From Swiss-Prot:
It is an enzyme of class 3 (hydrolase). This is dITP/XTP pyrophosphatase. Mg(2+) binds at residues 40, 69. Keywords: Hydrolase, Magnesium, Metal-binding, Nucleotide metabolism, Nucleotide-binding. Pyrophosphatase that catalyzes the hydrolysis of nucleoside triphosphates to their monophosphate derivatives, with a high preference for the non-canonical purine nucleotides XTP (xanthosine triphosphate), dITP (deoxyinosine triphosphate) and ITP. Seems to function as a house-cleaning enzyme that removes non-canonical purine nucleotides from the nucleotide pool, thus preventing their incorporation into DNA/RNA and avoiding chromosomal lesions. It catalyses: XTP + H2O = XMP + diphosphate + H(+); dITP + H2O = dIMP + diphosphate + H(+); ITP + H2O = IMP + diphosphate + H(+). The lineage of its organism: Bacteria, Bacillati, Cyanobacteriota, Cyanophyceae, Synechococcales. GO terms for cellular component: cytosol. Belongs to the HAM1 NTPase family.
Length: 196
């Protein structure tokens, strides 16, 4: 059987690269959403936004679609930036600077990354899973790898930021990796049922 086309509902190059590495062993052809395709994220949770994106891209392309919505929630900031993580400021550098400035008055630096994944076919949701990673916000950026808030998110118990880790390590302990650990058996089952 030919590979199944799966459209990644994202224009984020860092995220697309991670998805490709995480799904490397699957009989799927990973495609990216149409250039310029914009989806308004109107959900109030990461999962609602992932669902909105997966359905919209699947309906637009006629293929299965995989969407994620993920972000950083900082305890002292009442969960901010949360679902607004990518819209917190206009660049990664500015987002990091803004978050560090807002955290200055607080001693509590606990944070968690969450990744909600959704696979849809047309308007039907086929799979939904969420993964998490607990950590702390550092006082300054550390490391050169990754993207987004990776340089200021130190994983609990490891003393390393995401940006200090190589891809393999981040894949095994990170929020997206944890979500994919839950997604993969369900995706295998889905692909198996499509072959019948």
């Amino acid at each position: 059987m030919d590979n199944v086309p799966l459209v990644i509902a994202s224009g984020n190059k860092g995220k697309i690269g991670e998805f490709k590495k995480l799904l490397d062993d699957f009989p799927i052809d990973l495609l990216t959403q149409p250039v310029g395709f914009e989806i308004e994220e109107t959900g109030s949770t990461f999962m609602e936004n992932a669902r909105i994106k997966a359905i919209a891209v699947s309906q637009a392309t006629g293929n299965l679609s995989l969407a994620d919505d993920s972000g950083l929630s900082v305890e002292a900031l009442g969960g901010a930036p949360g679902i607004y993580s990518s819209r917190y400021a206009s660049s990664d550098k500015q987002r990091i600077e803004k978050l560090l400035a807002e955290l200055k008055p607080f001693s509590n630096r606990k944070a968690k990354f969450e990744c909600a994944l959704c696979i849809a076919s047309g308007e039907k949701v086929l799979i939904e899973v969420s993964g998490f990673c607990e950590g702390l916000i550092t006082f300054f950026p550390k490391g050169q790898n990754g993207f987004g808030y990776d340089p200021i998110f130190e994983v609990s118990g490891l003393g390393e930021t995401y940006a200090e880790m190589d891809h393999e390590k981040k894949k095994h302990i990170g929020h997206r990796g944890n979500a994919f650990k839950l997604l993969i058996p369900k995706l295998k089952q889905l692909l198996g049922s499509m072959k019948k």
